From Swiss-Prot:
It comes from Arabidopsis thaliana. Pathway: Glycan metabolism. Pfam families: O-FucT. InterPro entries: FucosylTrfase_pln, GDP-Fuc_O-FucTrfase. This is O-fucosyltransferase 7. Residues 515-565 are annotated as: Disordered. It is found in: Membrane. Its main location: membrane. CDD domains: O-FucT_plant. It is an enzyme of class 2 (transferase). Belongs to the glycosyltransferase GT106 family. Keywords: Carbohydrate metabolism, Fucose metabolism, Glycoprotein, Glycosyltransferase, Membrane, Signal-anchor, Transferase, Transmembrane, Transmembrane helix.
């Protein structure tokens, strides 16, 4: 009997031990699963309000908007002051909805884009979580917001003394800046501005009219309290005296009030032969500077067809996730003008020399491309851009929108860049030929599409500081200092050359150096730079930072500096 009892007791003990062991193992398995899943709960919180604001603003930024609405819609929401790494308990649902926000439009990709983005490329926001802030977060805006309303003493336009005709010159963004300057000049000299004529004779030979590129009626109405604008000269004024005048570059208030305004005593129609850089960047009355910003960021909006197509391109880029807009300035005319030929064949370099020699209005003919490059005066090559993006830490599946005309050398010239970044997109890849049909053969309209996609990008990087790069950077500053990385071309080419010569065996050191250099070149708020020391005359003005590259302090005010972040 005693043996049976002992046997029963032992059996009971063993059973309890087994049950306890099973419970412990179950608990360990449960904990192991959660240890694996937990990192997903710590994914960075994507502020949907921020992206929704920007997606909606593709439409809004081209509307005539009040200073109050600019403050509300264009500055970062207060919620954006919450750290990107937020409470793990609440982040899982927000993360899932954030992902759907970025990938639910994949059906918008046109049929000829043969492969849809892989799941890894769509979810690029989750790769390298600790680096999310470094790669995508905008710099602190320090509570700077647009402030473009005129002072209380600002009056309606005075009685017009005559008509100002304008022949713009250059590409899209050079013409845009010139038009905005002419609006301000018309105010200074009490002129009625006739809707400007776009450049049809320069390198691009674009036949677009003002109304093809811009919303003409909106332009006229938006400026009605500043100047009088008409579509064309009235009939029956053939007898009026006319004059063609080359306004002096970078001229100030006194030049226009005295020398130009005095011409009304003799002439009733003044035609400005050129529009580029005719007004000084600095030392103008605050109301004139604010008028330039109202003209640029409110009145001069793109035509309906361009805005609609631009919105579509942005939506299609957003379907791939967060994206970089890369202004890759490597077109034939750019290389010919600048004399830059690094990485080109002998025949290609010779072709560019012929173009430069045969283009009459390009004054400098003999250019040493090697010297230009080492001084940082050349656009980065596609290969150099690829090294830059890699050094900054962007993964190979990062969507990159190429904002450019026809790349010199075609697709083969992009091989080095594509070997590092496979998701290279462009308007030609995002849209069908039928969708782009009305814009083709019109370089100004195609550039306007690139402008919209660049403004709305998560990160903007120009390979060269030309007119578009400056215009986009200034607009992004105006919209809340969106992340804009300005490459130090001089430093980059020297570091890249070290790799090419084999002088640097460890590429990581080069990458670290490039990364370090660009930590302070990401579009943070700062005052516009003045002239370079030691410069005089026209060269002094040219060395200044362009007004439209950085409209601070004239058109951006700090709201409650004590709360700046």
């Amino acid at each position: 009997m005693r043996r049976r009892r002992k046997t029963v007791v032992v059996a009971v003990v063993i059973r309890r031990v087994l049950i306890w062991a099973i419970c412990v193992m179950t608990l360990l398995c449960f904990l192991t699963v959660h240890i694996y899943v937990a990192p997903f709960n710590r994914l960075p919180k994507l502020h949907l309000n921020h992206h929704n604001t920007r997606r909606g603003y593709i439409i809004d930024y081209n509307k005539s908007i009040t200073e109050q609405s600019l403050t509300r819609n264009l500055s970062r929401p207060e919620s954006n002051e919450i750290p990107l790494i937020s409470n793990p308990k609440t982040n899982e649902i927000q993360y899932q909805s954030s992902i759907s926000e970025h990938i639910n439009n994949t059906e918008l990709v046109p049929p000829h884009v043969s492969t849809s983005p892989s799941s890894s490329s769509k979810l690029n926001i989750t790769s390298g979580i600790p680096d999310f802030d470094k790669l995508w977060k905008h710099p602190p805006n320090r509570n700077f917001v647009p402030c473009v309303s005129p002072n209380p003493s600002y009056t309606s336009p005075l009685e017009s003394r005559g008509y100002l005709l304008v022949h713009t010159n250059g590409g899209l963004n050079q013409m845009r800046a010139g038009i905005c300057d002419m609006v301000a000049i018309a105010r200074i000299i009490n002129a009625t501005l006739v809707v400007p004529e776009l450049d049809k004779r320069s390198f691009w030979q674009d036949t677009s009219k003002f109304s093809d590129v811009f919303d003409e009626d909106h332009f006229i109405n938006a400026l009605s309290k500043d100047i009088r604008v008409i579509k064309k000269l009235p009939k029956g004024i053939d007898g009026l005296t006319k004059v063609v005048k080359h306004f002096k570059s970078y001229s100030g208030l006194s030049y226009y009030q005295n020398e130009i305004a005095s011409m009304w005593d003799e002439y009733k129609v003044i035609r400005a032969a050129k529009s580029d850089s005719r007004l000084a960047n600095n030392n103008l009355p605050p109301d004139i500077q604010k008028l330039r910003c109202r003209a640029c960021y409110e009145a001069l909006r793109f035509s309906t067809k361009i805005r609609s197509m631009g919105e579509l391109l942005v939506d299609r880029m957003r379907s791939y996730g967060l994206y970089i807009a890369l202004h890759l300035r490597f077109e034939k005319e750019m290389l010919a003008f600048s004399g830059c030929n690094h990485g080109l064949s002998a025949s290609e370099a010779a072709e560019l020399r012929r173009i430069r020699k045969n283009t009459a209005y390009w004054k400098v003919k003999d250019i040493d491309g090697r010297v230009q490059r080492l001084k940082g005066y050349c656009p980065l090559t596609p290969k150099e851009v690829g090294i830059l993006l890699t050094a900054l830490g962007y993964s190979s599946d990062t969507p990159v929108y190429i904002a450019a005309g026809e790349i010199y050398g075609g697709e083969s010239r992009l091989a080095d860049l594509r070997s590092r970044f496979s998701m290279l997109m462009s308007k030609e890849k995002l849209a069908t030929r039928e969708e782009l049909k009305t814009f083709m053969n019109h370089s100004t309209q195609m550039a306007a599409l690139d402008y919209i996609v660049s403004i709305e990008s998560d990160v903007f990087i120009p390979s060269y500081s030309g007119n578009m790069a400056r215009a986009v950077e200034g607009h992004r500053r105006f919209l809340g200092h969106r992340k804009t990385i300005s490459p130090d071309r001089k430093a980059i080419v020297r570091l890249v050359d070290r790799i090419g010569r084999g002088a640097e065996k460890d590429n990581r050191k080069v990458y670290e150096r490039i990364n370090e250099i660009h930590k302070t070149r990401q579009g943070s708020p700062r005052r516009r730079k003045g002239p370079a020391s030691g410069t005089k005359g026209l060269e002094r003005h040219r060395s200044e930072e362009s007004f439209y590259e950085n409209p601070l302090p004239d058109c951006l005010c700090q709201r409650d500096p004590s709360k700046a972040r």
